[in-house]
Amino acid sequence: MNEPTVTPPGFFKKLRLGNEYLKTWPVEKQLAPVFPENRMIKATRFGIRYMPPIAIFTLTWQIALGGDLGPAITTALFACSLPMQGLWWLGKRAATPLPAVLLNWFYEIREKFEQAGIALAPVEKTPTYLSLAHLLKRAFKQLDRSFLDDV
């Protein structure tokens, strides 16, 4: 498990951390009732894909129809900021330490890896949601679904 050192990041580091979290989190329907990440990742991916073209379309449409430049630029900037807001939220969430209930579940999943004879890197710091994402991604690939019974 190659986990980066998670420190309280600045704005751009938080966006990069959010992008890593977006790519790491396993979007599984069993996790949807417990974690808001599935909905946030889906909305952020939608925003990354469709908001820049929508921003360009609204900008050119308002200018072509003789609208003012100020509102056109404001609308385009707002549309482009939506995916950044999602990445920022994901980055903030990724750096958040796990609450006690999830911390216990985190260590239970690690224990199931040990029982299965699968080696894991030792936990160096307080586990964060990014650590949980790495662990869950690996668990969905290498363990049976019994680790979800405690969710």
Curated annotation (Swiss-Prot):
Descriptive protein name: UPF0208 membrane protein PMI1770
UniProt keyword terms in alphabetical order: Cell inner membrane, Cell membrane, Membrane, Transmembrane, Transmembrane helix
UniProt similarity note: Belongs to the UPF0208 family.
Localisation: Cell inner membrane
Disulfide bonds: none
Chain ranges passing through the membrane: 46-65, 69-91
InterPro entries in alphabetical order: UPF0208 (IPR007334)
Membrane topology: Multi-pass membrane protein
Species assigned in the record: Proteus mirabilis (strain HI4320)
Any single Gene Ontology cellular-component annotation: plasma membrane
Broad class of where this protein is predominantly found: membrane
Lineage of producing organism: Bacteria, Pseudomonadati, Pseudomonadota, Gammaproteobacteria, Enterobacterales
